[in-house]
Structure formats: C-alpha cells, structure tokens
Regions:
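Beta1-alpha1 glycine-rich phosphate/pyrophosphate-binding loop at the start
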Residues: 1-71, 149
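FAD-binding core/adjacent interface of flavoenzyme oxidoreductases
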Residues: 70-149
C-alpha cells in the first residue's frame, strides 16, 4: 500500500484526496491546522453579515468520509524531511511515499505589518468576523450621530 500525505485541506488538498481515493492501493493522510475546509470565495459574505461562519466551513473528515483509506489529522506541519520521507508536525511525524504540499497562502503586508489595522486580510474566519464586527460597529456609531451630514 502506497502512503500519500497531503498537507492542506483546502481546494487543492481535497481535490487530490478525492482523486486518489479511487485508487485501491493508496492510503491517504490529510494534515491541516484546522479540522474544517473553508470556502474562501464566500468569506466576504461572512464579513458583510450575510452568511454565518458555519455556512462556509465544513468538517474535512465529513467531506472525505466515503473512503476508509483516508484519514484526516489536525496537525500543524513544521518541517519536511525529504531524505527520510517524513512530514514533521507539532504533535507527530508522518512517513510518506508521495507528498502533496497544498498549504495555501497567508496574507502578507511585505514588511509593513502596521498596515493590518487599516487593511485587514480576508483569508480566515477570524478575519471575516473581525471585519463584520468593525462594519456593524460603524453602523451603530452612525445611528447615534446627531449631525446627518
């Protein structure tokens, strides 16, 4: 049985896991910091209070539950040992025959982190709910404004 480790439970990682699930001689392990898949294209809807966070996040295990040879582990990967063919996480290491890195991206201010308070990222549920909080707070402040202009 060939062991495949997929780092990342986003669109790319899930697509690879689903495609490989058709193979009979493959054991798949998906590693992700979170235990849910986030449908990022709708994060703006959470930020604008149109959708709730639960409406755009689904458990990764549930999405991949059809294949008994697929396991999903909540694991933050800290290193990859290419010579020993191991992925090293905060809690454990995982051996592989094939490795797929589908980690996604993080918001970057190119060394200008002070911009974050004025231009927050929109890549996570925490960021979306913080933007939502700011928008709703601005509406509340506007309601109590005595000068309408």
């Amino acid at each position: 049985m060939r062991k495949v480790v997929i780092v990342g439970g986003g669109f790319a990682g899930l697509s690879v896991a689903r495609g490989l699930a058709r193979e009979r001689d493959v054991e798949i392990t998906v590693l992700d910091e979170r235990n849910y898949h986030l449908f990022q294209p709708l994060l703006y809807q959470v930020a604008m209070a149109v959708l709730s966070p639960a409406e755009i996040a689904a458990p990764i295990r549930g999405l991949l539950s059809r294949n008994s040879r697929t396991s999903v582990l909540r694991e933050k990967v800290t290193a990859v040992d290419l010579k020993q063919r191991r992925v090293i996480g905060e809690d454990a290491s995982h051996e592989y025959d094939f490795l797929v890195l589908a980690c996604g991206v993080r918001h970057c201010y190119f060394g200008n982190e002070h911009w974050e308070s004025h231009a927050p990222g929109l890549k996570t549920l925490a960021q979306a709910t913080e933007i939502r909080r700011r928008v709703l707070e601005a509406f509340e402040e506007a309601e109590s404004e005595s000068d309408p202009t």
